[in-house]
Amino acid sequence: MPFSLCAQGEVDKMLTNLHWLGHASFRLDASRIIYFDPWKLPKDSRKAGIIFISHDHFDHFSKDDIALISTKETVLVTDKSVGRQLEGKLVCKEIKSLKPGNKIEVSNGVKVQAVYSYNLNKEFHPKEDGKLGFIVTIDGISIYHAGDTDYIPEMKDYACDIALLPVSGTYVMTADEAANAALAIKPRAAIPMHYGDIVGSNSDAEVFRDSLKDKVEVRILKKEK
């Protein structure tokens, strides 16, 4: 379970500071600048306080993009595979390599629970690989970045204020499956991701939204350039 759940007004405020950068990449402008799976970033991107990398596939783990936003004060949180590849090769304060089930305090006021992220009936993301989703708590808000996953049994035990869920199908769950995941998790707001690049289209995000009408609030974020 995450560390806290909060009021809707606080969630709405946090959502105004959450920026979809395309695919599974997000930036959160909170008390720390946080990135999830940064990829194809513009050269003038803001520097990161914390970077979360879910797994080692190229569209989630971009060494060039990580280097672009890292400083000597940046903390990177990731799985064991990415941690091994970056050890000693990145200018940053620290690399924290986690496995599903780990809970840590990344820095003052920022906590993370590493959770499972895997496929049930596809070969792309085996459970035994230890790829990650993250439930991050910052400024009293819990945000779940699911990584590349299907709708998995563990999700019924996850809770968060904001859920970032893949919807494209092919490598991850479909929009309908993602809607079922959202119903299991019951976030205050759900945001579709993992579409519009490589696989998936705007229609997947719309199917996800329509499937959850009057059940879970869905925000389709505009991709920032």
Give residue ranges: language-model regions.
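Binuclear metal-ion centers of metallo-dependent hydrolases, dominated by the metallo-beta-lactamase
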Residues: L18, L90-V110, A179, L183-K225
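Core dinuclear metal-dependent hydrolase active-site scaffold
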Residues: C6-R46, I95-A159, M173, K222-K225
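Metallo-beta-lactamase
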Residues: I135-R188, M193-G200
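Active-site metal-binding motif and surrounding structural segment of the metallo-beta-lactamase
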Residues: W39-E87, A159-L164
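Redox-cofactor binding/interface segments in oxidoreductases and associated redox assembly factors
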Residues: F36, F52-I53, Q113-S117, L165, ...
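N-terminal signal peptide c-region/cleavage motif recognized by signal peptidases
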Residues: P2-S4
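Active-site environment of divalent metal-dependent phosphoester hydrolases
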Residues: P42-K43, H57-F61, G83-L86, N102-E105, ...
